[in-house]
């Protein structure tokens, strides 16, 4: 639940969501009109989509921690020594933000998220600044707009401004052309399924996109790399018919627009 009081924004987070994995995605709703656009430039258009990035909220004492799970390894066994001991020292989460608890009930906590939504890289375009060639942030022109909550996700709309300076071709002592670009973005924070998909290793005979993880399970003293495929969560609508080998529709079909 979102509450607004003047310039302050608060989120009431149920205890049932603390520790649950969520993902953050960013969509450009309105892009800036730039004077010169590189021909090989891939991003910077309305509808461009960035992410996802995985996060979770955890409560420690009177603080709520926004953490980023480190998902680059598998097979770490707390009961083993060797490289497993070194892996445990790194931990499984990276701390991103600390939010003091403003109030709490028996089943939820209230935190202020004004600064988080305005300045944290997870909720703005900063991680994609190189691709977008945005320049310096003009903080005074940034605004958090409409925030909509749904059962499994929340949408945050905001305006972002950046100052861009283009220097003369070939260098020299001349001053560059300086101007401001303005963007409207939509950030989606959505709850991931509590039961993750079973990990499937890459097969060279099947053309899936894949990603690599460091595998600690093969040896106490040596690391190996395992490639996992990227796939959609397709659950058969009629499991019995699917088990008989019949063609069935998924519960949530993939829709392309």
Where would I find each of the regions flagged by the language model?
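Auxiliary tRNA-acceptor-end handling modules of aminoacyl-tRNA synthetases
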Residues: 1-257
